Amino acid sequence: MNSQGSDRKAVTLLLLVMSNLLFCQNAHPLPICPGGNCQMPLQELFDRVIMLSHYIYMLSADMFIELDKQYAQDHEFIAKAISDCPTSSLATPEGKEEAQQVPPEVLLNLILSLVHSWNDPLFQLVTEVDGIHEASDAIISRAKEIGEQNKRLLEGIEKILGQAYPEAKGNEIYSVWSQFPSLQGVDEESRDLAIYNKVRCLRRDSHKVDNYLKLLRCRVVHNNNC
């Protein structure tokens, strides 16, 4: 095994261990707050959420690499598979400079919309991947893990929004996933094409979420001094 592969596995394992501590009050007790309304410091909350978002991105990237290996030489398949992601309907900023121009509370709601939009598609993806006989155990386990961790990420982002910008809660817009209907009863090629594109979109969106959260931490917690 090459050193790059070893490093990747080591980092993934570390993120898995650390993610189990996220939002765990037993491992990280929340500070005692007046009136019993306890909240952890915003910086710590950002740190935990970003650790989890990066973990999800790494899992989705690894899952896409596993799928891509199967079709790397089939250029016709890849050309057919790649289509617009349903979340493209969300007007998310392209690049750091554009994201810097978006008010923090608006960007947080966009992040929340992206993460929330994946809840049902991830549930479908787990079922679809689990039904593929040739799917590796690694792909199946990653799909299940991402589905579970996405719920926790959603919870963490909602906590950040509620603590930093409570007046902005409820302004998120969720995309409609009509392009990804159930794959039950479709032929094998159509199923594989749809799953490939769904995982590709998952990797793209999880990378966006991870980058946006890191940018927001710098702006909100460190006043752009990072």
Curated annotation (Swiss-Prot):
Disulfide bonds join C33-C38, C85-C201, C218-C226. Residues 1-29 form the signal peptide. The keyword Signal applies. It comes from the Eukaryota. Its main location: secreted. Pfam families: Hormone_1 (PF00103). GO terms for biological process: female pregnancy; lactation; positive regulation of cell population proliferation; positive regulation of lactation; positive regulation of receptor signaling pathway via JAK-STAT; response to nutrient levels. InterPro entries: 4_helix_cytokine-like_core, Somatotropin/Prolactin, Somatotropin_CS. The modification Phosphoserine is found at S53, S117. One of its GO terms (molecular function) is prolactin receptor binding. Keywords: Disulfide bond, Hormone, Lactation, Phosphoprotein, Secreted, Signal. One of its GO terms (cellular component) is extracellular space. It is found in: Secreted. Interacts with PRLR. Belongs to the somatotropin/prolactin family. Prolactin acts primarily on the mammary gland by promoting lactation. This is Prolactin. The lineage of its organism: Eukaryota, Metazoa, Chordata, Craniata, Vertebrata.
